[in-house]
Regions:
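C-terminal His-loop and adjacent cap/lid subdomain of alpha/beta-hydrolase
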Residues: 2-465
Length: 465
């Protein structure tokens, strides 16, 4: 374990910012690191580092930088159109943790680094790695998770010997942490956790709360987050399932909202049209709480109870489902397949200037209510076979946190028979729809069989007893 000092421009930390220091990799990360995946099965290496430096303390503007999430008016914050910041204290010290997942061989590295703020529920989950480690691993991408300040106390509570030196003053130091992490990554020198890797692009992403963090950084700090030579620290942003307005930037932005998000958190008012550097997708039938990808050779962290950050909502999926239609099933929409395609399309946008597809929004009435087609599913939006060749009505909850959860209400067998005839004819329709999605770049070819398997599982052509 070693350390190296880094010379920094005044990245969100004031003119008197201290030099940042990187320490690591820490010993025995796969065995001792909290919330760290075992990635040896996909020929990756998991490492932990500590990054120390200084960052400004700001007046909060978002759930992502509030000391208590419950203290914020999320509808107002997510719809903000004015992006100045008030600095309360300049250049305050911090030490945070970085989790790095990288290919064991530098020759496998794609040149892409994906960074995310770790989620504050349960001590810091890496949501985008959880969903897309299969894609990142097969592509050779590097993932870097940046510990959210409000999750540091939980790490120290569980393992003070390992994490006792982590420290921060205020949740709003997150923005300086993200900027300095990005600058360290792109530095590629002795002070970089990725020294020796030739980095072409660094992307910031997130889902739900971490999607809000991504959009908030893009809105308030992208324009000042520069390297000494004037280059952007982050080359693209992919905020997902966060409902937040994102201002026009000088780099590509690609947004994803589910049927829970586009209207449930004020997202309907935060739409803007696609342009030369912006795409906004809404996925009909998808719910905010999405099904995980199939298990593979990467092993998730051992279950451990870590304290959540203050104000995080607590709700029961089982309680929410009691309010769903009788006989309905959990939403099975494979959001991870479209997320993988989004990253693939973003890479082509960056590397080849090949523009990604555009889509229409989910359709609504004058009051903002979702318009339904004759099968009971949302009209418009990006449409996977779940709603384009349906055997169920897909919906989301309508009250408080239950809007995060979705359901599928299966059609009676007689309805499926009337629509498609039999299972073979239904699967043929699904197959044709999948080929359309691949051709239009909404899913990748390796998602073909997973979509077919989901269709086979929901092909109810016999009455259930």
């Amino acid at each position: 374990m070693g350390s190296a000092a880094l010379q920094w421009p005044a990245l969100l930390a004031g003119a008197n910012a201290r030099n940042a220091q990187l320490i690591g990799p820490l010993p025995d990360t796969p065995a001792r690191g909290l919330m760290v995946w075992d990635v040896s099965g996909i020929d990756y290496v998991a490492e932990e580092y500590f990054l120390s430096g200084s960052a400004n303390v700001y007046r909060p503007v978002s759930m992502a930088d509030a000391a208590d999430v419950a203290s914020r008016d999320n509808f107002k914050d997510l719809g903000a159109r004015e992006f100045s910041r008030e600095i309360l204290k300049a250049a305050r010290p911090f030490t945070t943790r970085l989790i790095v997942y990288r290919p064991r061989s530098k020759q496998r590295f794609s040149g892409k680094v994906v960074a995310e703020c770790l989620h504050p529920t349960g001590g810091g989950g890496s949501l985008m790695w959880n969903s897309l480690h299969g894609f990142f691993g097969s592509h050779g991408d590097i993932y870097v998770g940046v510990q959210h300040p409000l999750t540091i106390a939980g790490l120290k509570t569980v393992d003070s010997a390992r994490y006792g030196s982590l420290d921060f003053e205020d949740a709003t130091q997150l923005w300086g942490m993200l900027a300095k992490t990005g600058a360290a990554i792109k530095g590629e020198g002795a002070g970089s956790p990725l020294r020796g890797y030739r980095i072409r692009h660094l992307l910031l992403t997130g889902y739900s709360y971490t999607g809000v963090a991504t959009a908030t950084f893009a809105n308030y700090h992208h324009q000042e987050a520069k390297l000494p030579d004037g280059r952007n620290i982050f080359d693209a942003y992919l905020p997902m399932a966060d409902a937040q307005y994102v201002r026009p930037l000088n780099v590509p932005v690609m947004r994803l909202n589910t049927q829970s998000d586009y209207n449930g958190f004020g997202g309907l008012k935060n739409r803007r049209p696609d342009d030369a550097r912006y795409r906004h997708y809404e996925f009909a039938g998808a719910a905010h709480v999405a099904v995980p990808p199939p298990a593979d050779a990467a092993k998730p962290p051992a279950a451990i109870k870590l304290p959540s950050a203050p104000g995080q909502p607590h709700f029961s999926a089982a309680d929410c489902r009691q309010g769903f239609p009788p006989g309905s099933l959990p939403n099975d929409y494979p959001l991870y397949l479209v997320q993988a395609a989004m990253f693939s399309n973003m890479y082509q946008w960056l590397d080849l200037r090949r523009a990604p597809p555009s889509s229409v929004f989910i359709e609504t009435n004058a009051e903002g209510g979702t318009l339904l087609d004759d099968k009971g599913n949302a009209q418009g939006g990006v449409r996977l076979p779940q709603v384009s060749v349906p055997t169920a009505k897909y919906g989301v909850g309508s009250t408080d946190a239950c809007v995060l959860f979705g359901y599928a209400e299966p059609f009676p067998a007689a309805v499926s028979q009337a629509l498609y005839g039999d299972k073979a004819a239904f699967l043929a329709r699904v197959q044709a729809d999948i080929e359309r999605l691949i051709a239009d770049r909404w899913i990748l070819p390796d998602g073909r069989e997973q979509l077919l398997e989901l269709a086979r599982a929901r092909a109810n052509f016999e009455e259930r007893s």
